[in-house]
């Protein structure tokens, strides 16, 4: 027999799959972005970075569409904690979509015209932006990387708090409100 109440407290399998696929891709992408050489010796890594970035953009748009068409489980926390969780989740969506878009803007405004070929197979167009925006696009892309890193740390810390609440409730024999951790797929 299916426990409908428990099922309503969990994210769907699709949401969980998108969450962890994007999380792993973001971790890889941030590590790659911070470690890539800034000269022509990193050409292959830049191509990989662009393909991973486009993939993150497409997956994030799919995740946003999923979120808009599938009801998430009820919020675990209220008050300031609930506000903070909602703010971090919203900003993570801005990051997951904004970061690839600013990267696309960097490539599109670069004085070095190198075509982008998605995973070496699909030509990817450049945005019709003036080259004068390149410096601002690069600075914004780098700033978003640091902001995204901070948001990820806040998100993981929030999950730690939620799991702690759930474990505390379980050890005391009480029920955690709304299932404190449904394996994070917000």
Each model region followed by its residue ranges:
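Membrane-embedded alpha-helical bundles that constitute the cytochrome b-like, heme-associated redox core
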Residues: 1-186
